[in-house]
C-alpha cells in the first residue's frame, strides 16, 4: 500500500543519509519480504521470496540517476554497491561542510503513521547536543521521529537568546532586539505559524523559563504548554517544527532556512 511505497523511498535514500556521516540510513528488514504459500499444509507453511529488489530513478546533484538496492537472504545486509551516485553525493556534502563551504544542503525526512507525541526518546548521543550541520540528518528517515530532538534543541536556542539579551542589558546596551538566536527562533515560529495558526489559532511557540516548557499563544485561549493542547494540534506543531528544525540545522547560513531549503519530506497520513 501507500506506506510500503514511502518505506521504499526511505530505503532508496538510505545510503545518501548514511554517507553524510552522523546518521543511519534506512535498510530492508525481513518483514519487508514477500511471503507465499508453496503447498497446502495444516501448519500453513509460508516461504519468503528472495531477492527483494528496489529500483529507483531520481535527480541527484542535477543529474538524472538510476540506482538499486537488494536483500538476498533472511540474515543478509541491504546492498549498497549500486547506489554509488548517492554515496558520492553524501560524501561530497560532508567534505564541503568541513571545508566551510556554504553549500545548501537538501532536507530529507520521513514521518510515518506510527509517529506519536514524545514516542521516541532522545538517546544519550542526542543529549550531548550535536552541533554539526549534518546532525540535521539524524533520524531523518525514522518514521517515528518527530518532536523530542527538536524540543531539546529549541529550548537551548531560547535560553541562549535570553542569556545574550541579559548580557547586553548588563553592559547598559539598550539595543537588545535581535541576536543570532533571535533570528533562529523567529524562523521556527514563522514556519509553525504558517501551517498551524490559520487552522487552529495557536502560534509563536517559545520556551518559557517560568513554566519550564515550550508554550504556544492563542488570542482566545491565552498561553498553554504544548502538552496541554490536543493530540492533533501537538502532532502538527511537532511535525512542522521538526521539519523547520532540520532545515535550520542543515542551512544555518540561510536567512529563512525553513522556507529556502530544498528537499523531500515524506508524510504518511497527514
Where do the PLM segments sit?
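Walker B catalytic acidic pair
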Residues: 268-270
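Hydrophobic "anchor" residues on beta-strands that sit immediately upstream
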Residues: 3, 264-265
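P-loop NTPase switch/coupling surface
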Residues: 1-151
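Extended helical coiled-coil dimerization/tether regions that scaffold
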Residues: 136-260, 264
Amino acid at each position: 500500500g501507500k506506506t510500503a511505497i514511502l518505506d521504499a523511498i526511505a530505503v532508496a535514500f538510505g545510503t545518501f543519509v548514511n554517507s553524510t556521516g552522523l546518521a543511519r540510513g534506512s535498510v530492508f528488514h525481513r518483514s519487508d519480504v514477500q511471503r507465499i504459500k508453496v503447498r497446502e499444509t495444516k501448519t500453513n507453511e509460508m516461504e519468503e521470496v528472495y531477492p527483494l529488489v528496489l529500483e529507483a530513478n531520481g535527480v541527484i546533484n542535477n543529474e538524472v540517476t538510476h540506482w538499486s538496492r537488494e536483500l538476498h537472504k533472511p540474515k543478509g545486509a541491504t546492498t549498497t554497491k549500486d547506489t554509488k551516485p548517492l554515496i558520492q553525493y553524501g560524501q561530497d556534502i560532508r567534505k564541503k561542510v568541513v571545508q566551510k563551504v556554504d553549500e545548501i544542503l537538501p532536507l530529507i525526512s520521513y514521518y510515518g503513521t506510527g509517529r506519536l507525541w514524545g514516542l521516541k526518546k532522545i538517546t544519550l548521543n542526542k543529549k550531548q547536543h550535536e552541533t554539526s550541520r549534518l546532525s540535521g540528518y539524524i533520524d531523518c528517515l525514522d518514521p517515528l521521529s518527530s518532536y523530542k530532538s527538536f524540543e531539546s534543541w529549541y529550548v537551548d536556542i531560547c535560553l541562549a537568546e535570553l542569556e545574550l539579551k541579559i548580557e547586553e542589558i548588563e553592559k547598559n546596551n539598550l539595543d537588545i532586539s535581535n541576536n543570532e538566536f533571535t533570528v533562529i527562533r523567529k524562523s521556527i515560529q514563522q514556519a509553525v505559524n504558517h501551517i498551524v495558526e490559520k487552522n487552529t489559532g495557536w502560534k509563536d511557540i517559545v520556551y518559557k523559563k517560568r513554566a519550564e516548557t515550550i508554550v504556544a499563544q492563542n488570542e482566545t485561549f491565552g498561553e498553554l504548554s504544548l502538552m496541554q493542547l490536543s493530540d492533533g494540534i501537538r502532532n502538527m506543531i511537532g511535525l512542522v517544527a521538526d521539519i523547520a528544525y532540520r532545515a535550520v540545522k542543515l542551512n544555518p547560513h540561510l536567512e529563512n532556512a525553513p522556507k529556502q531549503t530544498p528537499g523531500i519530506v515524506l508524510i504518511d497520513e497527514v
